[in-house]
Amino acid sequence: MDNVFEFPAGLYGFPDLKRFVVVDVPGAGDVVKQLVSTEDPNVGFTLVFPFAFFPRYSPDIPEEELVAVGAESAEQVLLYAIASVPEDFRKATANLRAPVLFNPFTRKGRQVILGDDRYGIREPLFQGADRIPAEEGR
């Protein structure tokens, strides 16, 4: 998925940036990607495939969010989470509350804020792959 995507609504915190390229990270397969603005190359994010870290992650994507990227069903989109990776990568977290949807057919993307409070904005990537974040007292 090394392509340019149009984000008509921008990303949260960056509403004016509309075009981003998804860049492969060598050796990371589909688990880790980089999302870089084509309009401001100083703006970039680390993306993680959340299901690799949280196999029980099961976000309910509202139909209107799917329609916004030109998808008829959740099966037509790729879903990633924006990660924060500090110097000590073992403390990396993912924003499971606001995943990023990509429709590889329309080349449209959208960040979605879920109404599901089981998922937090700073979920540790390396603390228990079998858990749903809510099981940890959220």
UniProtKB/Swiss-Prot annotation:
Q: Which domain of life is it from?
A: Bacteria
Tell me which UniProt keywords the record has, alphabetically.
Answer: Bacterial flagellum biogenesis, Chaperone, Cytoplasm, Translation regulation
Task: Note the InterPro entries from the entry.
Answer: Flagellar_assembly_factor_FliW, Flagellar_assmbl_FliW_dom_sf
Q: Does the keyword Electron transport apply?
A: no
- Which Gene Ontology BP annotations are present? bacterial-type flagellum assembly; regulation of translation
GO CC field: cytoplasm
Subcellular compartments? Cytoplasm
NCBIfam families, from UniProt?
PRK13285.2-2
What is known about its subunit structure? Answer: Interacts with translational regulator CsrA and flagellin(s).
Described by its record, this protein's role is as follows:
Acts as an anti-CsrA protein, binds CsrA and prevents it from repressing translation of its target genes, one of which is flagellin. Binds to flagellin and participates in the assembly of the flagellum.
Q: Which family does it belong to?
A: Belongs to the FliW family.
Q: What is this protein called?
A: Flagellar assembly factor FliW
Q: Which gene encodes it?
A: fliW
